[in-house]
Amino acid sequence: MSDKKRINQIAKETGLSNTELVATAQSLGFEVKSHSSSVTAEQAEKIIQGVKTGTDTIVKPAEKTVKAKIKTVPETAKSKQEDHPRTFAGKAVVEDPAILARIKEKEEAKKAAKTEAEPIEEVITTEKPKVAEPVKKSEPKAAAKAEETKVEKVEAKAKTVTPKAEVKTENVADKKEPVVTEEKKKSLTQKPRIQIKVIKRAEDIKKEQAAARPEKKKFDKNRNDRNNRNDNRRPNQNGNGQGHSQGGNHYDKNRPAGQGQNQGQKRDKFASSGSSSTSDTFTPAASGKNNRRDRDRKKTDSNRDNTKDGNRKGGPLRVNDNRNQVRNARNSNWNQKGGRGRYQNNQSSSVPATQRKFHELPESLEYEVGMNVQDIAKSIKREPAEIIKKLFMMGTMVNQNQSLDEDTIELILMDYGVTPLKKVEEDKSDIERLFVEDGYLNEDKMVERPAVVTIMGHVDHGKTTLLDRFRESRVTEGEAGGITQHIGAYQIKTNGKKITFLDTPGHEAFTSMRARGASVTDITILVVAADDGVMPQTIEAINHSKAAGVPIIVAINKIDKPGANPQRVTQELTEHGVFPVAWDPENGSEFVEISAKFNQNLEELLDTVLLVAEVQELKADPSVRAIGTVVEARLDQGKGAIATLLVQQGTLHIQDPIVVGNTYGRVRTMTNDLGRRIKEAGPSTPIELTGLSDVPQAGDHFAVFEDEKAARAAGEERAKRAQLIKRQNTRRVNLDNLFDTLKEGQTKSVNIIIKADVQGSAEALAASLQKIEVEGVKVDIVHSAVGAISESDISLAAASNAIIIGFNVRPTGLAREQAAQEEVDIRLHSIIYKVIEEVETAMRGMLDPEFKEEIIGEAIVRETFNVSKVGTIAGFMVIRGKVTRDASVRVIREGVVIHDGAIASLKHFKDDVKEVGNAQEGGLMVEDFNDVEIDDTFEVYKMVEIERKK
């Protein structure tokens, strides 16, 4: 043998394990790190001797803690077999007196340690050990194992702790070297704790527990029963003499069920009762019982065991125990439900398997027409079958998916005691209501907006020149290209404020906007030439402005001409209801004398516009979603639908979902009147946009929606409604249906447009018609002028739903065509009292259409045929004219009319025909008349309406 040997060589020679040798060498103070470390022969002998004889002779430094000693003191199966007496049938077999002497010394040291452990605050318990046989007093091996369950922290008494750590042994038949976990380290360092073993007899422990047990709330009965059953079924397998119940007590077959739990929960009651070495069982006790009791209430068994040393000792058993408890609980629930099939428990359970939750009925329910039973059941928290049953008892057979009418829904809700409330659906596609209602506007965010001005007047009075001067005034010299495009509306800035002008060449666009109820104009500038005076179109412009209800600013143009006479123009305008402010301060209009050609007094005209706008207090809310009106629209080959819009409320942004008239889309691009792209447009701002699905019409309203889906739905709905209205016959007011219209309450006044040959006749006719008053309905003269009936008159009549009276005048050819398209009623007269009588008769409902009889044919009966269940069919020959199916027939016999009625059927040979011509044969049957004879004459005629004389 060499001077030094490795630990693994020594293990092979002696048959000992490397772990035991390394642990013993380290406990002797040798520098040994692993089984590959080398020691001298002398050290090897000491190590072998130390393993065989134990570690009693090993002297440890007094300053080392128990924590370190636990790590460095190994236990081997071989040393245990040598140091502890073997047992047979519960009795110790003593083989070596030296071993008995050492055991006795250990017991004395243990007693001394227990008596000195006075300042103890809390017990540090180990995990539940495996089940073992009961420990007897005479068994030193069991006493030594009892020392294994103690983890102690000694503050200043190393002399009493050292022997404990040296004699502490462990059964390593199933487990390896003990390892102190981090949790145990943490618990050792938090508070000065020490474990006390109170060894008593089982009978004494039971008595003390019964006496010291306080009143407490019981745990769940099912849980305790399951735990007790598991404890009774599972044998004690731990070799250290401790059971795996909550208290860690020894398992006793004779003790009552649940005693282990009670002992574990109440071990603090008998912890201070002293110690005894003559008991068959032992129970760890603890101080700080209140904290312990709180933890027992809050933590489950598995959590408390795992926080201690579950991975070392009691962990696997506790996991299995938890799994068994879960399985037992599931089986218990299964048994309560009754099992499955023929193996189910026949005993009836007191608690039903499924218990329906009760829901209170609502006090009221807002319903929609067309709801089915399933919808109602979901709303009132009831089963559909229950509602179907109620309806069946009421005599109504329905299923849960069948739609119900309003009466049935209210009946079933009232039967349940629920107040039915019909839901009022808001038509989101009706964007016109936004122009009538202003409840959505925020008064706190209202700001001043620019005025919208329309220039109207006779075409030869300088309207176009005035528009050009305004355009030139807002274009600076630095702009390249000047005005690049004309979009029908533009803005100018004067005195720090903006004015929006609408370019409306002619009155067609303005009239169409009025017809759609879109009055976007705030102020009208009426241009009148100073040398010509008031012309027919000037009067028409005045009537348009008054019908729109907007103030008028009169611009007397061409004052630079030699024949200009502004005073005469003022006098003529007063005859048509336009008075200067000096004459009528309340309802008067501003008069400004200008010269558009020489830019004379244009600034004064703009200042007047700003003054009138300030008086009107024009405001808008830019924070809401934008609404407005279409000025004009067109279809571009490259860009698609292009619309010129005027924003009236809110702010329009790029990518806004928008509905324009009967179209929809998303704002793709926006261009202002200068041709520049912008990202947003505020109130009274004209813009040109792209992105619509179709070309809208001038005068249509537009509105921004919350999302594109809602905009699409609203646009499609509006297009569908427009198509439906287009298919229906538009009912215009005329003298024939005027009484019915008045009766239905659709009209409270008769709108009339008068066109006469001379001004005197027009004035006299207007005065006479305004005196007619029937049943509270009066005549309203919309427009009265001199001249032929023109297209403008037709447009005005269509917009105002008026009747045109022509006195000694005729309509033009284009006017007739437009009147037929617009379905405008034109009445032509030459006698004034005839006009008054006809209008009054129409208002009273006395005007009936006149008809005359027109004979279209004559036939002679040649043969008759009697057909059962049909009647008599007469075969005839047409001798003059023709016989038609939709005509009436007189049966004449010997010059006397014996019957007058309609033709029921008409045939040519065997074919049904609509007409039989001259010199042709056919057969007919007279409706409700069968007494037809040969040689009777058929006189065929029609009733034709007579056109009234003009």
From Swiss-Prot:
Stretch list, region G1: 457-464
G3: region residues: 503-506
Pfam families (UniProt xref): EF-G_D2, GTP_EFTU, IF-2, IF2_N
Annotated stretches, region: Disordered: 128-354
Gene3D superfamilies in the record: 1.10.10.2480, P-loop containing nucleotide triphosphate hydrolases (3.40.50.300), Translation factors (2.40.30.10), Translation initiation factor IF- 2, domain 3 (3.40.50.10050)
Residue spans of biased composition, Polar residues class: 322-336, 343-353
Boundaries of every tr-type G domain copy: 448-619
GO CC terms in record: cytosol
Positions annotated to bind GTP: 457-464, 503-507, 557-560
GO molecular function, one term: GTPase activity
Region (G5): 595-597
Biased segments, Basic and acidic residues type: 128-158, 165-186, 200-234, 291-312
Domain of life of the organism encoding this protein: Bacteria
Protein localization: Cytoplasm
G2: annotated segments: 482-486
Stated role: One of the essential components for the initiation of protein synthesis. Protects formylmethionyl-tRNA from spontaneous hydrolysis and promotes its binding to the 30S ribosomal subunits. Also involved in the hydrolysis of GTP during the formation of the 70S ribosomal complex.
Family: Belongs to the TRAFAC class translation factor GTPase superfamily. Classic translation factor GTPase family. IF-2 subfamily.
NCBIfam families: IF-2, small_GTP
Protein name listed in UniProt: Translation initiation factor IF-2
Upper lineage: Bacteria, Bacillati, Bacillota, Bacilli, Lactobacillales
